[in-house]
UniProtKB/Swiss-Prot annotation:
Single GO cellular component term: cytosolic large ribosomal subunit
InterPro entries tied to this protein: Ribosomal_bL12, Ribosomal_bL12_C, Ribosomal_bL12_C/ClpS-like, Ribosomal_bL12_oligo, Ribosomal_bL12_oligo_N_sf
Protein name in UniProt: Large ribosomal subunit protein bL12
Statement: the UniProt record of this protein carries the keyword Zinc-finger: no
Domain of life: Bacteria
Keywords linked to the UniProt accession: Ribonucleoprotein, Ribosomal protein
Its job: Forms part of the ribosomal stalk which helps the ribosome interact with GTP-bound translation factors. Is thus essential for accurate translation.
Quaternary context: Homodimer. Part of the ribosomal stalk of the 50S ribosomal subunit. Forms a multimeric L10(L12)X complex, where L10 forms an elongated spine to which 2 to 4 L12 dimers bind in a sequential fashion. Binds GTP-bound translation factors.
Keyword DNA-binding set for record: no
Length: 125
C-alpha cells in the first residue's frame, strides 16, 4: 500500500512547528528548491510603488538579553539551535547572540515567542 497525500498531510499536521520547519529545510536540500521562491512566484508581481516597499522575507533572530531566568533561556536556545549545554550557556551569557540567521518570517516569530516565553529579550533583524 502506497502512502497517500492525505497520509502525509495528517503526519505533518501532528508535527510541532519546529519539526515542520526542519522538514521544509530537508526537502529544500534534497530537491534543490526554495520554499520562499515558490511563495514569491505564486504571489505574482506587485505593481506601482509597493515594489519599493517590499516586505522582508528573511530575519535574523537575535537574543539581546537572557532576562532573569537564564536557565530557561539556555533551554530555549538549546532547543532552537541544537547547541550543547556549554555552548548554549556561553551564547546566553555572551549576548547579543544570533540564534538563527535568515529564518523565514514564520520561523522567526515562533523562535521569538519561545525565547520570550523563557524570559529573554529578542529582536528580529
Amino acid at each position: 500500500m502506497a502512502i497517500t497525500k492525505e497520509d502525509i498531510l495528517n503526519a505533518v499536521a501532528e508535527m510541532s512547528v519546529m519539526d515542520v520547519c526542519d522538514l521544509v529545510k530537508m526537502m529544500e536540500d534534497k530537491f534543490g528548491v526554495s520554499a520562499a521562491a515558490a511563495v514569491a512566484v505564486a504571489a505574482g508581481p506587485v505593481a506601482g510603488p509597493a515594489e519599493a516597499a517590499e516586505e522582508k522575507t528573511e530575519f535574523d533572530v537575535v537574543l539581546v538579553d537572557a532576562g532573569s531566568n537564564k536557565i530557561a533561556a539556555i533551554k530555549a536556545v538549546r532547543g532552537a539551535t541544537g547547541l550543547g549545554l556549554k555552548e548554549a550557556k556561553d551564547a546566553v551569557e555572551g549576548t547579543p547572540f544570533t540564534v538563527k540567521e535568515a529564518a523565514s518570517k514564520e520561523e522567526a516569530e515562533v523562535l521569538k515567542k519561545q525565547l520570550e516565553e523563557a524570559g529573554a529579550k529578542v529582536e528580529l533583524k
